[in-house]
Amino acid sequence: MDSDTLRVFQNELICCICVNYFIDPVTTDCVHSFCRPCLCLCSEEGRAPMRCPLCRKISEKPNFNTNVALKKLASLARQTRPQNINSSDNICVLHEETKELFCEADKRLLCGPCSESPEHMAHSHSPIGWAAEECRVQKLIKEMDYLWKINQETQNNLNQETSKFCSLVDYVSLRKVIITIQYQKMHIFLDEEEQRHLQALEREAKELFQQLQDSQVRMTQHLEGMKDMYRELWETYHMPDVELLQDVGNISARTDLAQMPKPQPVNPELTSWCITGVLDMLNNFRVDNALSTEMTPCYISLSEDVRRVIFGDDHRSAPMDPQGVESFAVWCAQAFTSGKHYWEVDVTHSSNWILGVCRDSRTADTNIVIDSDKTFFSISSKTSNHYSLSTNSPPLIQYVQRPLGWVGVFLDYDNGSVSFFDVSKGSLIYGFPPSSFSSPLRPFFCFGCT
């Protein structure tokens, strides 16, 4: 192969970003090849969508497979390139020969006679080029892959925390409104309690905002630390072989920092404060035996908008689909068309339940879709070890403590109002904004819906 052809061939093995032989090369959808670490570092802080650094075309898939053939050729090119090993620092003082071998046991560069000495005879020795390539593949690339994975996880958690913060701001504003409406229904002497309640909500919300902001700072710092460590390993990777191997003892010490615990996301939860006398007032409208004792097997499914609010980005793989585990539902024997009605349901023994009122026409269905169309439900769900409480009309996460015992439901048909209460605390869970009812509404309770 003539020198011009060889030069062209070698250029095909060089990344246009770092201008070095490829490290773990990948090929994008637009058929351009780059080092995976270079592509990661150029990916605009890891945000989607991924764009090609050369043509700026958006890649359809965020993850790319290693170009194995290109990786092998680049590795061979690195091992066969001229080694700058004839410097005075790389001459054995004892034998005055060039150190061309690397001792795996002692992590030292050796000349030929030293490698055959009694001290090193039993050890494994490798040529410098081969040993440096092994270090790159077995240590640096694996550590960089691990650090990038942690980087991506932390970035996703940071995005979630930012989303929670924005959602919580709106939720707190909304909760102020529904608390104010609830107190307006009560006697004038409760005004002072209402103000104390709102002030406590402000203080608690301020603490939660601070916790979320602190969490964002911690995650950002953790993210930057991982990126800095990743860059250090990337720079170490590109060191000349001799410097790299002389620095190999420090690699493990630096990468040990990557094992530090990741900052965990905050679970914002507001206290449900007791509203004096609310249960006494509601019991004036109590409906005895509101729900039938006869359980009907059914399948529950959540509409797309409800699933998105409850389960976030993972809503497509979340539970509660029509082909899932069979659930059991009970309805009230009576449908309401006017007046005020209050009843209580025990949810002690179920983590997954749906409670509220629905149109009377739905009672004949065994496949029930929970949406936001004239149904008013409180939904408790458990995914892995995470519990969530939400409502469906419109779909909304409830940032309050999940009730663990009896839940009270108050239907004010004439004023278009449905509210939920935590009976053990005498506190408000949520009150739907007033609307207009035009069809009969029937109490509904479903449990075991996973």
Swiss-Prot record:
InterPro entries: B30.2/SPRY, B30.2/SPRY_sf, Butyrophylin_SPRY, ConA-like_dom_sf, SPRY_dom, TRIM/RBCC, Znf_B-box, Znf_RING. GO terms for biological process: innate immune response; regulation of gene expression. Keywords: Coiled coil, Metal-binding, Zinc, Zinc-finger. SMART domains: BBOX, SPRY. A zinc finger (RING-type) spans 15-56. Gene3D superfamilies: 2.60.120.920, Classic Zinc Finger (3.30.160.60), Zinc/RING finger domain, C3HC4 (zinc finger) (3.30.40.10). GO terms for molecular function: ubiquitin protein ligase activity; zinc ion binding. Zn(2+) binds at residues 92, 95, 114, 120. A zinc finger (B box-type) spans 87-128. GO terms for cellular component: cytoplasm. Residues 269-450 form the B30.2/SPRY domain. Residues 191-218 form a coiled coil. It holds the Pfam family SPRY. Belongs to the TRIM/RBCC family. This is Tripartite motif-containing protein 64C. The lineage of its organism: Eukaryota, Metazoa, Chordata, Craniata, Vertebrata. The gene is TRIM64C.
